C-alpha cells in the first residue's frame, strides 16, 4: 500500500489511528495533546469484522470438529479444527495456571487418538467432552480466528513516515504526565511506535537519575559492554567514536548484537566551553586599524567554544521506501545480502551477532521491512555471494547512503537540557555534527521486546492483548 499524506496538524493521542493493514503514512509533525473527552482517552481496541448472522454448529467428524460460527466470516481457510490441536489448546483452570497463564499439563500425555464424545454449541462458545473424560470450552472468537487464519500475527502496527519536515512540530509528551500515570506512558510509547521517536519536555536535568527513572517507566535499562544507564562526556572512556566530539553519520546502534537495542535515549545535561588553558604570552599590539578586526576574531573563537553537536535523525523506514521505489534491485540486494558486524575496539571485547544479517531485515511472514541495521563503521567484510557480488552490494549501499544524506531525509535538532529524546533504534538512524566544548549526555538502551510489551499493556486492554501473544 502506497503511503498517504498526513497534514502537519496537532493531533491528540486518540486521533492517532491504529487501523489494520494501512501500515505507512507520510508524516509531517505531531504533538500529544491531552484529550478533553473521556471517550477519546479510552484505550484502543482491536477491530473485529464478525457479524452475528447464523446459528452456531459443531459436528464431530473423523478429522476433528466441523464448525459453523455464529458470525459471518470471510476468507475461510478451513471448516474443521483437529482434535489433538483443540485438546492441547484447552484453557480451563485445570489445563492452564490462571496466575501465570502457562500450561500445567504434559501435551504428549494426551492420547494421540483423542476425540470428542459430546459437543454442544451456543452463541458464545463450544463445549467438548473428550474421550479422556476432560471437558473443554472454547470461545467462538478463538475458533473463528483459526477457521480464517493460520497463526496470530503482530498487532496493527501502522506507522507514519517522515523526513526533514518533521522538525516543525515533532512528537512530544510531558515528563509530569509520563511519570504520573500509565496513560502518560501510553502516550509516549504510542508516539515512539508510530513515528519512531518522541521528546519528553519539562524533564528535570539537574540530576541524571531523574532521566533514568523516566526510562524505567517504559522498562528496565539494558546492560551492555558500555554498562547500563550512561552519563558521559567526550573523553574516549570507551573506544568508540560516540565518545569523541567528531561528527557521526546516520547509523543505528549495536548492529553487532544478535538483538540490537530496541530504544535509545539521549538527554543533553550540559554543553559548555572547555576549561581554558593558561594564556600564551600576549602578542605585540596590532596597528589601530586592525584592533577592531582582532577583537571580532577573538569574540568568534569564544563563541565557538561550546557550539555544534546538533543531533541528526533519519527515518530508516522512509529511506527504505524511497530506495524501493527508486531502485527495487538495490532494495533487494540490501535486504538479502547478509553481512558481518562487530564491536572489537576495546580490549577483551569481540562481539558479533549469532549470524550474518542484512542492512534491511524483512519480516519473514509479511515481507515488510522489520528492522534497519546500518553502521558502516561497524560493518565487517562484504562477502562473496552466489547471487550478488561485492561490487553489486557496494553500488546498492551507495544509493542507500545517498538517500540517507539527502536534505529531505535529514531531521536536525538541537538537544537541550530538560528535553530528552527517545527513539526506536530498529527504525530511526541517528548521528550528530561535530562540536566544541564539553557536552554531558545521559541515557540508556531498552530492549525491543520490553518496549513493545509496555506499549501493548498501556494502550490496549489486557483482555485483548492476551490473545495476541498467547495465540
From Swiss-Prot:
Ligand binding (Fe cation): 251, 253, 430
Molecular function in Gene Ontology: metal ion binding; trimethyllysine dioxygenase activity
Keyword field: Carnitine biosynthesis, Cytoplasm, Dioxygenase, Iron, Metal-binding, Oxidoreductase
CDD domains associated with the record: CAS_like
Enzyme class: oxidoreductase
Catalytic activity: N(6),N(6),N(6)-trimethyl-L-lysine + 2-oxoglutarate + O2 = (3S)-3-hydroxy-N(6),N(6),N(6)-trimethyl-L-lysine + succinate + CO2
A GO CC term attached to the entry: mitochondrion
Biochemical pathway: Amine and polyamine biosynthesis; carnitine biosynthesis
Annotated GO biological process: carnitine biosynthetic process
Main location: cytoplasm
Biased composition annotated in UniProt, kind: Pro residues: 276-288
Tagged with keyword Cell cycle: no
UniProt-annotated location(s): Cytoplasm
Cofactor(s) listed in the protein's UniProt record: Fe(2+); L-ascorbate
Domain of life where this protein originates: Eukaryota
Annotated spans, Disordered: 272-302
EC annotation from Swiss-Prot or TrEMBL: 1.14.11.8
Cofactor binding, per record: Binds 1 Fe(2+) ion per subunit.
PANTHER family with a match to the protein in the record: GAMMA-BUTYROBETAINE HYDROXYLASE-RELATED, TRIMETHYLLYSINE DIOXYGENASE, MITOCHONDRIAL
Family statement drawn from the similarity comment of this UniProt entry: Belongs to the gamma-BBH/TMLD family.
Function, in words: Converts trimethyllysine (TML) into hydroxytrimethyllysine (HTML).
Protein name: Trimethyllysine dioxygenase
Organism: Neurospora crassa (strain ATCC 24698 / 74-OR23-1A / CBS 708.71 / DSM 1257 / FGSC 987)
Amino acid at each position: 500500500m502506497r503511503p498517504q499524506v498526513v497534514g502537519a496538524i496537532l493531533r491528540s493521542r486518540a486521533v492517532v489511528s491504529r487501523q489494520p493493514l494501512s501500515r505507512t503514512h507520510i508524516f509531517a509533525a505531531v504533538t500529544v495533546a491531552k484529550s478533553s473527552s473521556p471517550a477519546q482517552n479510552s484505550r484502543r481496541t482491536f477491530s473485529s469484522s464478525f457479524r452475528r448472522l447464523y446459528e452456531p454448529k459443531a459436528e464431530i467428524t473423523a478429522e476433528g470438529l466441523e464448525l459453523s460460527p455464529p458470525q459471518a466470516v470471510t476468507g475461510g481457510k478451513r471448516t474443521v479444527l483437529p482434535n489433538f490441536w483443540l485438546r492441547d489448546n484447552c484453557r480451563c483452570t485445570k489445563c492452564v495456571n490462571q496466575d501465570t497463564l502457562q500450561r500445567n499439563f504434559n501435551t504428549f500425555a494426551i492420547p494421540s487418538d483423542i476425540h470428542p464424545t459430546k459437543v454442544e454449541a451456543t452463541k458464545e462458545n463450544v463445549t467438548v467432552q473428550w474421550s479422556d473424560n476432560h471437558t473443554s470450552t472454547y470461545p467462538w472468537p478463538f475458533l473463528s480466528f483459526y477457521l480464517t487464519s493460520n497463526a496470530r500475527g503482530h498487532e496493527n502496527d501502522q506507522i507514519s513516515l517522515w523526513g526533514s519536515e518533521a522538525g516543525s512540530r515533532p512528537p512530544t509528551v510531558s515528563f509530569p504526565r509520563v511519570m504520573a500515570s500509565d496513560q502518560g506512558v501510553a502516550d509516549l510509547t504510542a508516539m515512539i511506535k508510530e513515528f519512531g521517536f518522541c521528546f519528553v519536555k519539562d524533564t528535570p536535568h539537574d540530576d541524571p537519575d531523574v532521566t533514568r527513572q523516566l526510562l524505567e517507566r517504559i522498562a528496565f535499562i539494558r546492560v551492555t559492554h558500555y554498562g547500563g544507564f550512561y552519563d558521559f562526556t567526550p573523553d574516549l572512556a570507551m573506544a568508540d567514536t560516540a565518545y569523541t566530539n567528531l561528527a557521526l553519520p546516520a547509523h543505528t546502534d549495536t548492529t553487532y548484537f544478535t538483538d540490537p537495542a530496541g530504544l535509545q535515549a539521549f538527554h543533553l545535561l550540559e554543553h559548555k566551553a572547555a576549561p581554558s588553558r593558561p594564556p600564551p604570552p600576549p602578542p605585540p599590539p596590532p596597528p589601530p586599524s586592525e584592533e577592531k578586526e582582532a577583537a571580532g576574531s577573538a569574540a568568534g573563537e569564544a563563541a565557538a567554544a561550546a557550539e555544534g553537536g546538533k543531533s541528526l535523525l533519519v527515518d530508516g523506514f522512509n529511506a527504505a521506501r524511497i530506495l524501493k521505489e527508486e531502485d527495487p534491485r538495490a532494495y533487494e540486494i540490501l535486504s538479502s545480502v547478509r553481512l558481518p558486524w562487530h564491536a572489537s575496539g576495546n580490549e577483551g571485547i569481540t562481539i558479533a551477532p549469532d549470524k550474518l544479517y542484512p542492512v534491511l531485515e524483512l519480516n519473514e511472514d509479511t515481507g515488510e521491512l522489520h528492522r534497519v541495521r546500518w553502521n558502516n563503521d561497524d560493518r565487517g567484510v562484504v562477502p562473496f555471494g552466489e547471487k550478488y557480488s561485492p561490487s553489486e552490494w557496494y553500488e546498492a549501499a551507495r544509493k542507500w547512503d545517498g538517500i540517507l544524506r539527502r536534505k529531505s531525509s535529514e531531521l536536525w535538532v538541537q538537544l537541550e537540557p530538560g528535553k530528552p529524546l527517545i527513539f526506536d533504534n530498529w527504525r530511526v538512524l541517528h548521528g550528530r555534527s561535530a562540536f566544541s566544548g564539553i557536552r554531558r549526555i545521559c541515557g540508556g538502551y531498552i530492549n525491543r521486546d520490553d518496549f513493545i510489551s509496555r506499549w501493548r499493556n498501556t494502550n490496549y486492554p489486557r483482555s485483548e492483548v492476551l490473545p495476541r501473544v498467547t495465540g
